[in-house]
């Protein structure tokens, strides 16, 4: 069982685009979409007058996430949408925790991270130093969403990040960025009964998940398989959703 970004999941299942495996990976199926992940761009506050859009990061030290990660793929695509290549920046491939540490140490100017918000590393960083999250321009987001389908499937959407998620965002000025859904996938080797019980436990624990992390409040069973493309539901998950009155096709 794993949680994956839907864009990466569909690429893996169909061996699309920048997915560098020798063949498609079809040994898994979907348990359910659970929450939204947003593309977060964190910037040192002393750069606020100069870094107003992603186009302004040229010449800076930028972490684009772990090599081969969904964050790295998202960062490269977003930078390209603003006319920035990796040759225009000093690239670092750091995890979110290492990015936050490097920024605190004065060794990094900007970092990307795709995840549910809030993210602990960013929440803790904003208490240690002044930072801001960079919003994206509407026109660029519209073009990005239109031009970055995964195969035939639209997986990206505009999403807001607010003061309730990060105190460094003004209460009266939420930012808008690009989001993608995070999905639980399971091995096809698991039985129908096993995955049925796992799916049932997930959705019956929704309120407890929300108490543990804010992303749980956005869980909606009606969106459990909306943007999974051609990746199939596991039969056990499909059985549960059918019992809940959802049309699994």
Regions found by a protein language model. Name each.
Residues 1-58, 66, 73:
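Short, glycine-/small- and polar/acidic-enriched structural segments
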Residues 86-104, 116-118:
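Short helix-initiation/N-cap motifs at beta->coil->alpha
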Residues 1, 77, 97-111, 123-127:
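Short helices/loops that flank or line small-molecule/ion binding pockets
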Residues 202-220:
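Periplasmic-binding protein-like
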Residues 12-29, 121-138, 144-164:
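Ligand-binding "clamshell"
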Residues 134-197, 248:
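C-terminal lobe and pocket-closing loops
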Residues 3-17, 96, 112-119, 137-138:
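Beta->alpha turn/N-cap motifs
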Residues 48-61, 235, 239-249:
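Immediate post-signal peptide segment of exported/extracytoplasmic ligand-binding proteins
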């Amino acid at each position: 069982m794993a949680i994956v970004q839907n864009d990466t999941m569909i690429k893996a299942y169909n061996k699309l685009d920048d997915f560098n495996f020798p063949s498609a990976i079809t040994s898994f199926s979907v348990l359910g979409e659970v929450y939204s992940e947003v593309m977060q761009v964190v910037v040192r506050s002393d750069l606020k007058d100069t870094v107003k859009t992603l186009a302004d990061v040229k010449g800076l030290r930028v972490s684009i996430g772990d090599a081969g990660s969904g964050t790295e793929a998202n960062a490269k695509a977003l930078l390209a949408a603003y006319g920035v290549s990796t040759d225009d920046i000093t690239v670092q491939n750091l995890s979110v925790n290492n990015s936050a540490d490097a920024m605190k140490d004065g060794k990094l100017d900007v970092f990307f991270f795709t995840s549910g918000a809030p993210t602990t590393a960013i929440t803790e960083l904003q208490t240690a130093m002044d930072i801001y999250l960079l919003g994206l321009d509407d026109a660029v987001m519209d073009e990005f969403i239109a031009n970055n389908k995964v195969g035939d499937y639209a997986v990206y959407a505009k999403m807001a990040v607010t003061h309730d998620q990060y105190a460094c965002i003004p209460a009266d000025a939420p930012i808008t960025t690009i989001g993608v859904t995070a999905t639980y996938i399971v091995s096809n080797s698991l039985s129908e009964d096993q995955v049925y019980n796992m799916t049932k436990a997930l959705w019956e624990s929704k309120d407890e998940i929300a108490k543990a992390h804010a992303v749980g409040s956005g869980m909606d069973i009606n969106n459990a398989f909306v943007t999974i493309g051609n990746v199939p539901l596991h039969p056990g998950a499909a059985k549960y959703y059918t019992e809940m009155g959802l049309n699994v096709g």
